[in-house]
C-alpha cells in the first residue's frame, strides 16, 4: 500500500470516528427512528411549522449518519480494492482519486459540525449592493450575484430572488437572494463585507484598468422560536411598482414593499410576490432577520472586528480582493487564502474561503 493511500485512509478513518462521536451515534440513530415513526403518523402535518422543523432535524440526522457509514465503508473496502489494483497503475490512480474525494467530504463535514451558532443551520438572506462607480460597480454586483447563485446550485441549495434593482446601463444596483439549505447561514455569514474587483473595464473604450466595489450583507432566516420584538411605530412602509423580470404583473400595481426601521436605519424591500400582501409578509420576515443579525453582530463585535458598525464601501473595509488584470488572483484579506483560479471562483467555487473563515472563527473563539 502506497504511503499516500495509507495516509488518506487514516485521515478518513479519523474523520469518521470524530463525526461518529459528535453525532453521539446511539442517540442519533435512536432519534432518527423516532422522527421517522412520528412522520408516518396521519396527524403529523396538523402543525405544519412543527412538522417542518422535525423533518429538517430528521434530514440532518439522516445525512450525518449516512456520511459516517459511507466513510467507514470506504475505509473497509480500501484493502480489498488495493489487492485488486495491485500492479495496475490506472486502478490505483482511480482508488486514490476516490479516497481523496472521500477525505475532502470528511474534512468539510468536520468543519460543518462546528457550525454551532443558534442560527447557523438556517436558511439566509444575502443582499448585494453596488458601491460608488456607476456601471462598473453595478456590473460587479451582478457578477457577485451569479457567483453566489452558482455556489448554492452546486451545493443543492435552493435560491429565490426576492428583490432586484437593475443598473442604469448594465448589471444591478442591488439584489436580495434567499438561500435555502442546511447551514446556509453558517457557511455564508463570513461573506459579509466589501468585495473588490480589479480588471480592464469592458465599458471603457480606452481599455483602462478599473477598481470596483460591492458589499455583501448576510442574515439568517428566522422562525417564530427566535423572538425579535419590533415596535410597528418604528417602521415606515413604502410601496412602489415592481421592476425587472416578473411577467405581466410588473409595473401594473404598487405591489413592491419597502420597510425602513427608523431607529437603526435598516431597510429591506421585496417585490418577488404577486401581491402587495405577499411582499409585505416577506419584507417583515426580512426585517426581523436583519435586526436579529444586528444583534448577532453586537455579540461578535468584541471577538471579531469585522462585525463592527457598517462603514463606507471603499478601500479600507474589504474582506476579499478579485484581481483579473494585470495578473489573476483572488485573495481573502482576513485568512490570507488565495487562488489564481479566478474563473472558478466567479463560477461559485468559494468553499476554500468559507472553510478557512469558519476554521479561523472557531480557532479565535477557542482562544478567547
Curated annotation (Swiss-Prot):
GO terms for cellular component: cytoplasm. Pfam families: PCRF (PF03462), RF-1 (PF00472). The keyword Ligase does not apply. GO terms for molecular function: translation release factor activity, codon specific. Methylated by PrmC. Methylation increases the termination efficiency of RF2. Peptide chain release factor 2 directs the termination of translation in response to the peptide chain termination codons UGA and UAA. This is Peptide chain release factor 2. It comes from Hyphomonas neptunium (strain ATCC 15444). The lineage of its organism: Bacteria, Pseudomonadati, Pseudomonadota, Alphaproteobacteria, Hyphomonadales.
